[in-house]
């Protein structure tokens, strides 16, 4: 599967495309693991043209190409920084973009969700994963947010289970701020 993905994605890069990925674990895999697992020049090409979604959007902003005409305000957002974004040394690009929305206040929460890939979802580790995530479960409601966000869907699931909040991907909050409604 890796070789087929690399072949397909490398062809897209050669056509002038960038690979933009909304999931931090997936972008980490393409950037860091594919070159190591596949070892080919194509895998390195794919890695060098892969961007996390908010890494890409903030680059557009830096180049003056991102529309920042937001029509709705998200209020206070408790933003969970996923471990696979930290591992990519990207900083807090999602939080940075959310802060561009007028009237937003973003509190970054750097706590472990206890999921660790799918480890924390396995029956034998689930209770341990919840224990690991207890500091996160305390920090989210303590932030008194209007909204909760995480780029990582598994971390969002864990946050929902541990806090009762309904985390959303930051791009959903950005879409709301643009006034884009789901169909």
Indicate residue ranges for each PLM-predicted region.
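Iron-sulfur cluster-binding electron-transfer modules in prokaryotic oxidoreductases
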Residues: 1-183
């Amino acid at each position: 599967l890796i070789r087929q993905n690399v072949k397909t994605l490398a062809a897209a890069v050669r056509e002038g495309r960038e690979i933009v990925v909304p999931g931090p674990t997936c972008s980490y895999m393409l950037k860091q693991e594919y070159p190591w697992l596949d070892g080919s020049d194509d895998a390195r090409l794919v890695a060098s043209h892969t961007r996390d979604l908010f890494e890409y959007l903030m680059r557009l902003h830096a180049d003056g190409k991102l529309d920042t005409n937001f029509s709705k305000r998200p209020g206070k957002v408790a933003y969970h920084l996923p471990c696979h974004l930290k591992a990519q040394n990207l900083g807090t690009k999602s939080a940075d973009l959310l802060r561009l929305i007028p009237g937003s206040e973003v509190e970054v929460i750097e706590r472990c969700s206890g999921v660790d890939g799918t480890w924390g979802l396995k029956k034998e580790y689930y209770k341990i994963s919840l224990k690991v995530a207890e500091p996160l479960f305390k920090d989210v409601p303590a932030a008194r947010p209007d909204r909760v966000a995480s780029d990582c869907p598994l971390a969002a699931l864990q946050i929902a289970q541990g806090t009762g909040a309904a985390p959303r991907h930051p791009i959903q909050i950005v879409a709301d701020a643009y006034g884009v409604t789901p169909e």
